[in-house]
Swiss-Prot record:
It catalyses: Endohydrolysis of (1->4)-beta-D-glucosidic linkages in cellulose, lichenin and cereal beta-D-glucans. One of its GO terms (molecular function) is cellulase activity. This is Endoglucanase 1. Its EC number is 3.2.1.4. It comes from Persea americana. Glycans are attached at N254, N359.
Length: 494
């Protein structure tokens, strides 16, 4: 929920009262899952680890990142199971962590400080990347092909730590606008707890968005094989420009951003119907975000975004005239074979966020002759979250360290190799592959990691080398944090 809006909180809790039951032994422990979903980010940290680091099998890493280029790029997150820092997915992760805290932070009082710490670990890095060199944004540390040819702990890595940036000559509107969105969203989160930091975030977001908008182009074109096929901007940069402007408007309340949205929306994707929300494609997320302005503030020019949000919602609801989503026999939303759970967590978050907006305005989604209520959206989101946490045909939790049965062979270098505490001597590049292909479980539990997940028949191979199913990623976890906060406060039933 929008924690700055007591009315929104009241409406959402009022709707949930008819759905809440007393907790029993059969209830999933959403509070435990919430805590672990945030803890996961400590396993992805790059840089000098703090004294309160809880995943103690990790150590310091990447302490000279950027130094050979005379910039400080220490910190941030490794994106997944490797030792690379990719700017586009890291910025999206940051935006989604921030959005989750904005909407649902007041429902996780015991975890909100940990959530803010996870967010700040990323924003501190993004601030460095945004301000190190004028008219430039640093968007990557590490050479992907060299990194992937090794199986090394981040504490040992000796592969090239090349640094890549976008600039006025080699633009990257997609990654820059996403970075602006991340910084703007985070500025809302820190508005009450650290006003000077919040101001710095917003000021930087404004500058980065100006850079993204003025020097247009895709970072995939500028950087080529450095980012492709790993994190190509397949959707282009229009979606990020509209997304970034939307977040800057929400964070700053500056009317110029609403003017930008109204003047440029149609050319930047406002009329598109799209059915996936991810680190690459922000169109659906933007529509949900802007629908708030119509539903709660009655900004008529934003009604279009509510209409397209309804189209997205209707595509997910079986029985509606425009239903087109694919679900596995066990009920999991299925979008693709590689890291499918990234789409499940982002969809669950959007369902709950839109339910919040509908509740606060007394609205509903229109699917032809069918009316879809906030309660319907909450129910569908719960099915997806519960599937991830173990209510599925395999009776397996896809969150590492949660529940009685979860994957043991996670595609993650640091987790699969002996920790530096146990094996302080370096394990070289090629020597590490014996651990990739070994049969014992990972020696270090990457608590809270959500993996890529099962296939379209609910089948999962607990195989460390099957990265499509067994690799975690920050952008899989980030949307789930807000969703788990909601269900921890509201263990709703059908």
């Amino acid at each position: 929920m929008d924690c700055s809006s007591p009315l929104s909180l009241f409406h959402l809790l009022l709707v949930c009262t008819v759905m809440v039951k007393c907790c029993s032994a059969s209830d999933l422990h959403y509070s435990d899952a919430l805590e672990k979903s945030i803890l996961f980010f400590e396993g992805q940290r790059s840089g000098k680890l703090p004294t309160n680091q809880r995943l103690t099998w990790r150590g310091d890493s990447g302490l000279s990142d950027g130094s050979s280029y005379h910039v400080d790029l220490v910190g941030g997150y490794y994106d997944a199971g490797d030792n690379l820092k990719f700017g586009l997915p890291m910025a999206f992760t940051t935006t989604m962590l921030a959005w989750g805290i904005i909407e649902f932070g007041c429902l996780m009082p015991e975890q909100v400080e940990n959530a803010r710490a996870a967010l700040r670990w990323s924003t501190d890095y993004l601030l460095k990347a945004s301000t190190a060199t004028s008219n430039s944004l640093y968007v990557q540390v590490g050479e992907p092909n060299a990194d992937h040819r090794c199986w090394e702990r981040p504490e040992d890595m000796d592969t090239p730590r090349n640094v890549y940036k976008v600039s006025t000559q080699n633009p990257g509107s997609d990654v820059a606008a996403e970075t602006a969105a991340a910084l703007a969203a985070a500025s809302i989160v820190f508005g009450d707890s650290d006003s000077s930091y919040s101001t710095k975030l917003l000021h930087t977001a404004v500058k980065v968005f100006e850079f993204a908008d003025q020097y247009r182009g895709s970072y995939s074109d500028s950087l080529g094989s450095v980012v492709c096929p790993f994190y190509c901007s397949y959707s282009g940069y229009n979606d990020e420009l509209l997304w970034g402007a939307s977040w800057l408007h929400r964070a700053s309340q500056n009317a110029s951003y609403m003017t930008y949205i109204q003047s440029n929306g149609h050319t930047l994707g406002a009329d598109d119907d799209d059915y996936s929300f991810s680190w690459d494609d922000k169109r659906v997320g933007t529509k949900v975000l802007l629908s708030k302005g119509f539903l709660q503030d009655r900004i008529e020019e934003l009604q279009l975004y509510k209409v397209h949000t309804d189209n997205y919602i209707c595509s997910l609801i079986p029985g509606t005239s425009s239903f087109q989503a694919q679900y596995t026999p066990g009920g999991l939303l299925y979008k693709g074979s590689a890291s499918n759970l990234q789409y499940v967590t982002s969809t669950a978050f959007l369902l709950l966020t839109y339910a919040n907006y509908l509740n606060s305005s007394g609205g509903h989604a229109s699917c032809g002759t069918t009316t879809v209520t906030a309660k319907n959206l909450i129910s569908l989101a719960k099915k997806q979250v519960d599937y991830i946490l173990g209510q599925n045909p395999a009776k397996m939790s896809y969150m590492v360290g949660f529940g009685e049965r979860y994957p043991q062979h996670v595609h993650h270098r640091g987790s699969s190799l002996p920790s530096v505490q146990v094996h302080p001597n370096s394990i070289p590049c090629n020597a590490g592959f014996q651990y990739l292909y070994s049969s014992p479980p990972n020696p270090n539990i990457l608590v809270g990691a959500i993996l890529g997940g099962p296939d379209n028949r609910d089948s999962f191979s607990d195989d460390r080398n099957n990265y499509q199913q067994s690799e975690p990623a920050t952008y899989i976890n980030a949307p789930l944090v807000g969703a788990l906060a909601f269900f921890a406060a509201n263990p709703v039933t059908e």
